[in-house]
């Protein structure tokens, strides 16, 4: 019996395993939407000749040819002949700053993965471009010849054939310098730039040396400056940290003092505030016995990027309520106003306004009616589907007016006064007292009876 139960349990487990739903991975479209690839120089110009140490810009175009959903991906692999300069991710955005996809780069596999956002759920006709910066992998290229490089495109490959020339190093060590400056991007935080300035490697005697730094656009100072004094053997003999701040001309100064057989290394950081292709700073050294010497340094942004576009969904069509002419509006009641009787449309009160029906009188004009009820001629024509400004006596117009205006122009009803009598302490109305000008049918009747009685009396006496 136990064996039967065991067999039954095993069968149930097997069936359950087959029937259990499995989570499906998001669709990866690979390179199927990428239509073209090209190699460019750092100015974004297509090129075919490069040096072995050139920095190459790889540019792709893409067109989304079918519906895609958020969470789905496109992927590109980096050819073996190239090495990425920057492994930071980047957003693929439209011109309004909306993110179409987010790109991540796997340094180990050399794969760029673009994951679609919710943008693709509501937009169509998606297309765009992206780029990444790379150098040539010296292990996988041949210099002074054409190198076929296969790039993934349309889930196959497109071969580009750049000519890569060898770089010959020149002889000599170069003369010592007075000012030298260089910069680089931080390895992890691509918004931080590290700047290094070397002063007086030539070991020239300088009295009262002053260093001036001019910061280029797109960046601001970050923290302090570190000043290291070195002897003739470039050994650090003193270190000084100074606060730095920009003046109105985006300069800051550091007092270096007298330099006798000494050199100086200054380091400081800046924070990128505006995305640019490059960031430039200027270094200037002057002294009592030294005319100003300046050098510029530039850090190029070798990060990846891209942009795209999509057609947004059409705005929903607002359905207009069916037109109901004034003659067919449901009427709740009629009120007397300064402008004659107005019919109140049933259940029309909304946001402090109410719909009424006005009957056109002789001499009425559209501007006149509009002025009476504090509305515009255009509104009256719209509410009544009027195509001309002509009105006819007896014509009904529906108007949406302020409820406060209706209260203001409404004529209060005339109150009738009644005669009363007291019965057991309770006052009760016994009849309506006649108003001035009223006619009472009982007056002629009583008068007639009185005349008959008088005639009868005089007749008996005679």
UniProtKB/Swiss-Prot annotation:
Superkingdom of origin: Bacteria
InterPro entries hit by this protein: Adhesion_dom_sf (IPR008966), Collagen-bd_dom (IPR008456), Fibrogen-bd_dom1 (IPR011252), LysM_dom (IPR018392), LysM_dom_sf (IPR036779), SDR_Ig (IPR041171)
Record-level GO cellular component terms: extracellular region
Transmembrane segments: none
Keyword Cell inner membrane tagged: no
Family annotation (Pfam families): Big_8, Collagen_bind, LysM
Prosegment residue ranges: 437-462
Record keywords, A-Z: Cell wall, Peptidoglycan-anchor, Secreted, Signal
GO biological process: cell adhesion
Sites of Pentaglycyl murein peptidoglycan amidated threonine modification: 436
Domain LysM, chain residue ranges per copy: 356-399
Induction: More prevalent in stationary than exponential phase (at protein level).
Motif residue range(s): LPXTG sorting signal: 433-437
Topology of this chain in the membrane: Peptidoglycan-anchor
GO MF annotations in UniProt: collagen binding; lytic endotransglycosylase activity
Position of the signal peptide: 1-25
Identification of the protein by name: Cell wall protein Lmo0880
């Amino acid at each position: 019996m136990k064996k039967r139960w065991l067999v039954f349990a095993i069968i149930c487990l097997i069936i359950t395993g087959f029937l259990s739903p499995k989570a499906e991975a998001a669709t990866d479209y690979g390179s199927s939407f990428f239509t073209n690839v090209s190699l460019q120089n750092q100015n974004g110009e297509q090129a075919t000749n490069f040096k072995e140490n050139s920095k190459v810009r790889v540019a792709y175009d893409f067109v989304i040819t079918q519906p895609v959903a958020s969470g789905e991906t496109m992927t590109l692999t980096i050819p073996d002949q190239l090495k990425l300069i920057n492994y930071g991710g980047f957003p693929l955005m439209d011109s309004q700053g909306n993110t179409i996809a987010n790109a991540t780069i796997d340094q180990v596999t050399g794969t760029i993965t673009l994951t679609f956002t919710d943008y693709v759920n509501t937009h169509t006709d998606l297309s765009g471009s992206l780029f990444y910066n790379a150098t040539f992998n010296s292990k996988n290229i041949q210099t002074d010849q054409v190198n076929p490089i296969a790039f993934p495109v349309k889930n196959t490959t497109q071969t580009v054939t750049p000519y890569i020339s060898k770089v010959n190093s020149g002889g000599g060590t170069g003369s010592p310098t007075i000012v030298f400056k260089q910069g680089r991007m931080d390895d992890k935080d691509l918004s931080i730039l590290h700047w290094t300035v070397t002063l007086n490697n030539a070991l020239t005697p300088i009295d009262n040396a002053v260093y001036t730094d001019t910061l280029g656009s797109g960046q601001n100072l970050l923290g302090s400056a570190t000043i290291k004094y070195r002897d003739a053997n470039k050994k650090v003999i003193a270190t000084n940290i100074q606060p730095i701040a920009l003046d109105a001309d985006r300069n800051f100064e550091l007092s270096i003092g007298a330099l006798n057989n000494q050199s100086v290394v200054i380091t400081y950081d800046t924070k990128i505030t505006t995305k640019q292709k490059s960031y430039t700073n200027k270094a200037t050294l002057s002294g009592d016995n030294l005319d100003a010497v300046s050098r510029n340094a530039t850090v190029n942004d070798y990060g990846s990027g891209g942009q795209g576009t999509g057609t947004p969904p059409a705005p929903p069509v607002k359905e207009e309520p069916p037109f109901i002419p004034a003659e067919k509006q449901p009427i709740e009641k009629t009120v007397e106003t300064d402008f004659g009787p107005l019919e109140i449309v049933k259940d029309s009160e909304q946001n402090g306004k109410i719909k009424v029906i006005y009957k056109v009188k002789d001499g009425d004009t559209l501007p006149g009616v509009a002025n009476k009820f504090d509305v515009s001629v255009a509104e009256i024509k719209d509410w009544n589907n009027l195509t001309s400004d002509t009105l006819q006596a007896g014509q009904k117009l529906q108007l949406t007016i302020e409820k406060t205006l209706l209260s203001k122009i409404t004529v209060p009803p005339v109150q009738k006064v009644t005669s009363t009598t007291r019965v057991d302490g309770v006052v009760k109305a016994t009849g309506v007292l006649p108003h001035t000008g009223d006619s009472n049918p009982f007056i002629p009747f009583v008068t007639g009876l009185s005349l008959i009685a008088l005639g009868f009396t005089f007749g008996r006496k005679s």
